[in-house]
Swiss-Prot record:
Potential calcium-dependent cell-adhesion protein. May be involved in the establishment and maintenance of specific neuronal connections in the brain. Keywords: Calcium, Cell adhesion, Cell membrane, Glycoprotein, Membrane, Repeat, Signal, Transmembrane, Transmembrane helix. This is Protocadherin beta-17. Residues 712-795 are cytoplasmic. One of its GO terms (molecular function) is calcium ion binding. It comes from Pan troglodytes. It comes from the Eukaryota. The chain crosses the membrane at residues 691-711. It is found in: Cell membrane. Glycans are attached at residues 169, 184, 418, 436, 567. Pfam families: Cadherin, Cadherin_2, Cadherin_C_2. Residues 30-690 are extracellular. One of its GO terms (cellular component) is plasma membrane.
Length: 795
């Protein structure tokens, strides 16, 4: 609300200082553009509709307007296309002078609803000005007694451009007496100085003419020149000295023309013409010589032109005192212009609506801007309207206000309002400006319901029970009776694929919202819809709000192992060389979790291993690595069970079974492990059955062979002579005949076990290798025939 002004209890005020940069129905962001100066009128700057994300024709529908400070408009808006154009050619030097960067502020006003958008246009400098010396010829008197190394300041060149386009360097024409030194000043300017290289002789050369060149940094660069006339004078012992090196003075901007500003004073200890002093401006600009003049004899500086604080706040110049012998001294004069309250505030009306519907609170009546070119308290302003009126002044952007209805208007009580807007500054004396407007009230019957919030956010945990109450929306109507009775409804969703009717319902009387079914976070994380509130007036009015439902994740999904596959097919066996170093990467368990957040954070650990301590699992990435060096004593086959666990509450887990085979080299074959299913008990039982069957068949076969040999031996023993044994001539191997009389055989039998991929065992029985003897009692070597084996398979 407004703050009362002293001595004005009948007015309400809003202090602009407190509410600077406060935005109403608009964001605080500023759109910024830049354009080169001197571009033609109508040049394209930007497309506001595109940059602001507005639809085609929305700027025209909302009556978009460009507002600038004061009455000067530099920009224009094409509402249909949204293009922002230059209204006229802009000269950076005229608008900003030596201020860099040069920024022009503007605002865009939108209606329905009212919205302000702050904008900045930066004028970029082009090198359209060349350096310029204020004097075509610079006179410099130098005593012939000056020592080498003495420096003599020269007058600088002026360049209206800024930055790199202003003066960057000076040069002097070639000569044998001087060279040029450029000094960088704290104000950013560069000052040329002549430095004496060798002693001067007036009798040999009484004067010298040089050319001073100033070069800017533009592309292409521009130059300016001035002639330097050096007059060599007789030896002068003393240099003029000012009483102060720097003079400072404050001058009110309303000081009359011709008034004395300040007097500078210097003295010279020489006598005669060498002691006579003459004062003049040394380093100065056009603005200085237009505003001030100096008495060459007395050193008085007087006002030549009326000062204006709003244009120039301070002046800096160098004053030179020269004696008759050519020597000179210099001092600096700083003149600060003091602001006085000589400008009344200005009010610029941007939007005015004369007809306002009754019972329409916060309806915009007018939009206007205020300004005061003064500074300090003289430029601070307060804005107010009369008291006891149902209207409110609301600051929007800096020095922009909106006049709107504060409460319900009743046309039957009062059909017309005369409002006086008063803008007062805080200077001494205070100046003010008044603006009168007339507002007519149009008759209506009711007010639309208004939601307590423009948007609602509801949280529902997944796997909820159907018909769960998830939240409420609420709207109120400023009317009474049936006009204030509000009913709620779900509006058609903007997303045609959202089955809103099967997700939520609303109680039409109280706005309670219910979930119609159990929600699944993995299928639907969030959804939004609009609800409407309609009163029962005639005609009925309604409003709407946005409801956003966020489904909270529950830990209802266990981790799923992607690798190694756990689908009951052939097991995946990892080969590890026995020469592997500790930390050797065996494999990596890859798993995912359908949940989110910490419910999907997975950790890995080794749950079971054939030989604990041989392998390890990294907790965060599932990498299976060797924990130590492998040895020949380590079993060749290993079975690892890796546990994958999420971070939910309660946690869920899954296991992955790995088979590892230790090999001496990757080139040798390996036997797959018999287990395909993770059930260890079933695999152990199958192994027992296979061993028992193998032992039984082997025993039966061995018994049959022994019986056959015994029968043959018995038959031969009958025909053999006493103490003598005979070996048949056929291919029967002699090593199967018991010649020692102990009736035992020395032949060994062996078998292999072949494990097929179908997890069913196959046995391969091998017949002993029978060597061919060269002859009885020869004692020759035997040769193994590997092709004489018989295979027997059992499934």
């Amino acid at each position: 609300m407004e703050t009362p002004l002293p001595k004005a209890p009948e007015k309400r005020q809003v202090t602009a200082i407190i509410f600077l940069l406060l935005l109403w129905e608009a964001g605080s962001a500023t759109i910024k553009y830049s354009v080169l100066e001197e571009r033609d009128s109508g040049s394209f700057v930007a497309n506001l509709a595109k940059d602001l994300g507005l639809g085609v024709g929305e700027l025209a529908a909302r009556g978009a307007r460009i507002l600038s400070k004061g009455n000067k408009q530099y920009l224009q808006l094409e509402r249909k296309s949204g293009n922002l154009l230059l209204k006229e050619k802009l000269d950076r030097e005229e608008l900003c002078g030596d201020i860099d960067p040069c920024i022009l502020h503007f605002q865009m006003l939108l209606k329905n609803p009212v919205q302000f958008i702050q904008g900045e246009l930066q004028l970029q400098d082009v090198n359209d000005h060349a350096p310029e010396f204020l004097e075509n010829e610079i006179l410099l008197k130098i005593s012939e007694g000056s020592h080498p190394g003495t420096s003599f300041p020269l007058k600088i060149a002026q360049d209206l451009d800024v930055g790199s386009n202003t003066v960057q360097n000076y040069s002097i024409s070639t000569n044998s007496y001087f060279h040029l030194f450029t000094r960088n000043h704290s104000d950013g300017k560069k000052y040329p100085e002549l430095v004496l290289d060798q002693a001067l002789d007036r009798e040999e050369q009484p004067q010298l003419r040089l050319t001073l060149t100033a070069l800017d940094g533009g592309s292409p660069p521009r130059i300016g020149t001035s002639q330097v006339l050096i007059v060599i004078v007789d030896i002068n012992d003393n240099v003029p000295e000012f009483a102060q090196r720097r003079y400072e003075v404050q001058v009110p901007e309303n000081t009359p023309i011709g008034s004395l500003v300040i007097t500078v004073s210097a003295r010279d200890l020489d006598a005669g013409t060498h002691g006579e002093l003459s004062y003049s401006f040394f380093q100065y600009s056009n603005q200085i010589i237009q505003a001030f003049e100096i008495n060459s004899i007395t050193g008085e500086i007087r006002l030549k032109k009326a000062l204006d604080f709003e244009e120039i706040q301070s002046y800096h110049m160098e004053v030179e005192a020269s004696d008759g012998g050519g020597l000179s001294g210099k001092c600096t004069v700083a003149i600060e212009v003091m602001d006085i309250n000589d400008n009344a505030p200005e009010l610029t009306m941007s939007l005015l609506i004369s007809d306002i519907l009754e019972n329409s609170p916060e309806t915009v009546v007018a939009v206007f801007g205020i300004s005061d070119p003064d500074s300090g308290n003289n430029g601070k302003m307060m804005c107010s309207i009369q008291d006891h009126l149902p209207f409110l002044l609301k600051p929007t952007l800096e020095n922009f206000y909106t006049l709107l209805t504060e409460g319900a208007l009743d046309r039957e009580s009062r059909a017309e309002y005369n409002i006086t807007i008063t803008v007062t500054d805080l200077g001494t004396p205070r100046l003010k400006t008044e603006y009168n407007i007339t507002v007519l009230v149009s008759d209506v019957n009711d007010n639309a319901p208004a939601f307590t919030q423009t948007s609602y956010t509801l949280f529902v945990r997944e796997n909820n029970s159907p018909a769960l109450h998830i939240g409420s929306v609420s709207a109120t109507d400023r009317d009474s009776g049936t006009n204030a009775q509000v009913t709620y409804s779900l509006l058609p969703p903007q997303n045609p694929h959202l089955p809103l009717a099967s997700l939520v319902s609303i109680n039409t009387d109280n706005g309670h919202l219910f979930a119609l079914r159990s929600l699944d976070y993995e299928a639907l994380q969030e959804f939004e819809f609009r609800v409407g509130a309609t009163d029962r007036g005639s005609p009925a009015l309604s409003s709407e709000a946005l409801v956003r439902v966020l489904v909270l994740d529950a830990n209802d999904n266990s981790p799923f192992v992607l690798y190694p596959l756990q689908n009951g097919s052939a097991p995946c066996t990892e080969l590890v060389p026995r020469a592997a170093e500790p930390g050797y990467l065996v494999t990596k368990v890859v798993a995912v979790d359908g949940d989110s957040g910490q419910n999907a954070w997975l950790s890995y650990q080794l749950l079971k291993a054939t030989e604990p301590g041989l392998f390890g699992v990294w907790a965060h990435n599932g990498e299976v690595r060797t924990a130590r060096l492998l040895s020949e004593r380590d079993a060749a086959k290993h079975r690892l069970v890796v546990l994958v666990k999420d971070n939910g509450e309660p946690p869920r887990s899954a296991t992955a079974t790995l088979h590892v085979l230790l090999v001496d080299g990757f080139s040798q074959p390996y036997l797959p492990l018999p287990e395909a299913a993770p059930a260890q008990a079933q695999a152990d039982s199958l192994t027992v059955y296979l061993v028992v069957a193998l032992a039984s068949v082997s025993s039966l076969f061995l018994f049959s062979v022994l019986l056959f040999v015994a029968v043959r031996l018995c038959r031969r023993s009958r025909a053999a002579s006493v103490g003598r044994y005979s070996v048949p001539e056929g291919p029967f191997p002699g090593h199967l005949v018991d010649v020692s009389g102990t009736r035992t055989l020395s032949q060994n039998y062996q078998y292999e076990v072949y494990l097929a991929e179908s997890s069913e065992s196959q046995f391969k029985f091998l017949k002993p290798v029978l060597p061919n003897f060269l002859g009885e009692g020869t004692g020759g070597d035997s040769e193994t025939n590997s092709n004489s084996r018989n295979h027997f398979g059992f499934n």
